[in-house]
Amino acid sequence: LASSAASDVYKRQAFTSLLINYDPRVVNYKTLTKRLQKLLKLDVNEEISTSRVFEIPVCYGGEYGPDIENIAKNAGLTEEEVIKIHSSKDYLIYMLGFLPGFSYLGGLDERIHTPRLANPRIRIPAGSVGIGGSQTGIYPLDSPGGWQLLGLTPVKTYDPERENPILFEAGDYIRFVPVSEEEYL
């Protein structure tokens, strides 16, 4: 899709769907459908686009991750084990939603799947890294939320002043890198 009239075709992927908006005065319908049919025939393991990997520093636990003790207890692990598991892999961004730039990350190790809070918080600070069920993610803005928080990143994942306000795209990867409080500050 990107190779022909990229600026005239808008696409947005989610978990099980793909939205494609286009201007039929600019992009021919038959050409577009032929291109889509070719894409549908690709091996799902074949790389279609170039993904980026973002290393995101996270200060885990303490005041930065107020729920890490509960996450560890729920999993039957120590806090250190939770941190090691959470930061040991690259997470695929399945989709963005809920808030501008909120990344729904897949591939969370089953050992640290954690239920959402029974009573969501009124305010979660921007940069909070949380777990909600089988997913992990980063809150891009101060907002209400029900995910359990295990850390905080100083990286601004959403900044309306940037040329591209949202740092990530669906299909990119995030790698969490533990940092000390001194490194965080």
Regions found by a protein language model. Give the residues of each.
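Single conserved hydrophobic/aromatic residue that forms the stacking wall/gate
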Residues: 1-6, 10
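A generic structural motif
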Residues: 16-22
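Well-ordered alpha/beta subsegment
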Residues: 25, 31-36, 150-185
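Anionic-ligand-binding alpha/beta catalytic cores of soluble enzymes and soluble regulatory domains
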Residues: 58-113
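Short, surface-exposed secondary-structure edge patches
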Residues: 95, 120-122, 163-167
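Short, Lys/Arg- and Gly-enriched loop/turn segments at beta-strand edges
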Residues: 96, 138-142, 179-185
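Short, basic/aromatic beta-hairpin or loop at an interaction surface
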Residues: 102-109, 140-156
